[in-house]
């Protein structure tokens, strides 16, 4: 799986045109990726942290070489980020789990069990990656978070 991004619209490009550009270019990239046997996972990032914007793009790209690179820490301002993550989980081909999650614009400790359960409920069968960006000493924090994730999986 190669992680890909939709990017940000260039100045003067409408949201509608930006979405059309992403769809057209991802379809081309999927054709090439398929020739090489490579999956492309588009991450909910930048312009696509808004799941209402991301899902129509994902659904428009009908390719066996395409899916979502699920990132639990990249969600637009919402009071229920878990609900938004559950919407992209069924399309996920790779999952990056962060220990913090944005809730109404503020970072909170992520409910790792809830994230793993929503992936399980979507029949996710891919890799789960810990992407640590927390404020604690990573040499102490990462082993603890890995243990929690292993127990949940």
Residue ranges and their predicted role:
Residues 1-67, 75-77:
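Active-site acidic/histidine proton-transfer and metal-coordination neighborhood
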Residues 50-153:
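Histidine-acidic metal/acid-base catalytic patches
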């Amino acid at each position: 799986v190669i992680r890909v991004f939709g990017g940000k619209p260039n100045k003067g490009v409408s949201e509608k045109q930006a979405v059309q550009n992403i769809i057209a270019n991802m379809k081309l990239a999927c054709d090439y990726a398929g020739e090489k046997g490579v999956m492309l996972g588009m991450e909910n990032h930048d312009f696509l942290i808004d799941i209402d914007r991301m899902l129509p793009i994902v659904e428009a790209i009908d390719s066996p070489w395409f899916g979502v690179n699920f990132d639990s820490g990249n969600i637009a301002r919402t009071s229920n980020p878990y609900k938004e993550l559950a919407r992209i989980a069924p399309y996920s081909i790779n999952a990056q789990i962060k220990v913090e999650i944005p809730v109404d614009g503020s970072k909170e400790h992520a409910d790792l069990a809830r994230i793993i359960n929503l992936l399980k409920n979507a029949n996710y069968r891919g890799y789960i990656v810990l992407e640590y960006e927390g404020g604690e000493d990573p040499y102490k924090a990462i082993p603890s978070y890995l243990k929690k994730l292993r127990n949940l999986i």
